[in-house]
Design a protein with these regions (language model features):
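Short, Lys/Arg-enriched N-terminal segments with co-localized hydrophobic residues
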Residues: 1-6
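Glycine- and small/polar-enriched repetitive beta-structure motifs of secreted/surface proteins
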Residues: 10, 15-19, 23-30, 37-47, ...
Length: 287
């Protein structure tokens, strides 16, 4: 072979009847199907040149002006952002707005903390905010709203689900119509409400309405601070009271009711049992 030509004559591509596909073989192999030959070395060389070209472009590109498509709008002087959709608006560096009347505005100089809004009417208007869904609203730093009409309106609040609302700092509302309306509150389940600071409501329509209250179970209800209600339709309605079991009820301060249909009515009362066991003021009832 002559120097410079050997690489172009070592391999070729032929049709393999047994494998029913093209295969790479030695130049010396016979091709029974025809005369067409593809030079592998040339293809590899072309790919190498193309890849090198892409790398050079990426390295040279740097920051680019924000882009608008389909009548979207971008704020002058902002870079690397994107607005797609009629009246979509990207108003800060690297922020992304996709959807009719969506708005993404990180309201921060730091381009590493962009906002992202996706969905008709979605608004993400704080640093590192994310709003995803029809009319989803994430309006404070690091807030996340996912779901139709979901709202996360305080720092680091998280709302996930249709009409879910997290309106306290670091609050979490997960589930359709779930509401966490105080700092560090957690509501998990359809229609749950955690209204007290650091309160927890878990289960369909469970409620925790005071500081550090815990309501777990369908329709569990806690109205006073540090109260605990666990079980379907259980109820804690005094400070520090505990009700555990279906339809159990603790209505006196520091009272404890454990068991189905048990009731602790008075301060410091303890009722343990089933089917209507009741403890009065300071008393203990077991049965």
């Amino acid at each position: 072979f002559k120097e410079g030509k050997c690489m172009n004559k070592i391999f070729k591509v032929i049709w393999s009847k047994s494998k029913q596909c093209y295969v790479v073989v030695s130049e010396m192999a016979k091709n029974k199907t025809g005369k067409k030959k593809i030079v592998v070395a040339s293809i590899l060389a072309a790919l190498a040149m193309q890849t090198a070209g892409v790398i050079d472009v990426a390295a040279a590109a740097g920051d680019q002006p924000s882009r608008a498509l389909a009548d979207g709008r971008v704020t002058n002087g902002k870079t690397n952002g994107l607005a797609i959709g009629n009246f979509a608006s990207s108003e800060s560096h690297q922020s992304i707005a996709i959807g009719y009347y969506s708005v993404a505005n990180a309201a921060e100089i730091d381009p590493a903390l962009p906002a992202t809004a996706v969905g008709a009417g979605a608004h993400a208007t704080g640093q590192s905010t994310v709003a995803l869904g029809l009319l989803a609203q994430a309006t404070s730093g690091k807030a996340t709203a996912l779901g139709s009409k979901s709202v996360a309106s305080e720092d680091a609040a998280v709302a996930v689900g249709s009409d879910a609302k997290a309106t306290g700092g670091y609050a979490s509302a997960l589930g359709a119509d779930a509401t966490a309306s105080n700092n560090d509150a957690t509501a998990f389940g359809h229609g749950t409400v955690a209204a007290g600071a650091s309160s927890t409501a878990l289960g369909s329509r469970a409620k925790a309405g005071a500081v550090a209250g815990v309501g777990i179970g369908m329709l569990a209800n806690v109205t006073n601070q540090y109260g605990v209600a666990i079980g379907g339709e259980s109820s804690s309605t005094a400070d520090n009271s505990i009700a555990i079991g279906r339809k159990s009820s603790a209505t006196g301060e520091n009272g404890i009711a454990i068991g189905t249909f048990t009731t602790s009515k008075g301060t410091n009362g303890v009722a343990v049992g089933t089917n209507g066991t009741t403890a009065e003021l300071g008393g203990v009832a077991v049965g």
